[in-house]
Amino acid sequence: VTLTSTLALMATSLMAEQIKVGVSPGEHAEIMEEVARVAEPMGLEIDVIEFSDYVVPNQALADGDIEANSFQHVPYLEAQMKDRGFALAVVGNTITTPMGVYSDKITDIANLEEGATFGIPNDPTNGGRALLVLQQLGMIKVDPEAGLVPTVLDIIENPKDLSFKELDAAQLPRSLADLDAALINTNYAIASGLSPKEDSIAMESADNPYVNVIAVQKGNEDAPWVKTLLEAYHSDEIKAFIDESYHGTVI
C-alpha cells in the first residue's frame, strides 16, 4: 500500500501543472501560500511570487512572467488596464480588506487637530479610496462627480483644514512618525506588524466596492488551472484559515 501511495504521489507530481502567482506582502501572500498547499493535491503547483509594490505585479502578468496575480481590487485593475494598456481579465473574487486609519500620535480620530497632515497612497485608485474613507468618517467632503477616484483637488469641504502627503502605499507604515495619521491598506499594515483590529483608530466600512480579485492574461480565463486555483481559494480550508488568522479584519 505504501509503495502504491508513493507511486501515485509521484505520478501526480509529474502530471501537476505549475504556475506562478504574484502577490503583495501581508495577507495576500499569506493566504496564497495556504492556497498553494491546498491546491497541490489537486494537481496544481503554485509558486508564490511576492512583489513589494502595486505596479509590478500587473506588468509581470502582462509580460507573461507570472500566470496570475492576487493583490488588487477591481477599480485599481481597471485603472491600470486603462492607463497602461494591459490585456488582463478577472477570473474570481478573493477577499475584502477594509482600509484603516493609523496614527502614532492619537488614539481617537475625533482628537485630530486642525491642520493635521494625513498620509494617503499616491496611486489614483487607492488615494481616491483613502479620501472616500475620510469622507465616510465625516472629516472631508469630495465632489461626487469624481466617483471612486477623487483627488485632493476634488475636496469641496475640509473643516479641519487637513493637508495631505501622497506617498507610495508601501511607505506609509514607515512614515507614521512624520505624519499625524495615515490611511493604510490592510496588506501593508499587516506586513509592517500593525494589527488592523488593535492598532487602527478608524476603519473603512466593510460594505465597499473594493473586493480583491485574481487576474490572468486575457485569453487564459478558461485555462484548466484557473478552475483549480479558484476551487482551492474558495475551499472551506482557506475560509477557516482566513477566519482564524485575521479575526474579521479580512473578509
At which residue positions do the language-model features occur?
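Short, well-ordered beta-strand elements
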Residues: 17-26, 44-50, 117-118
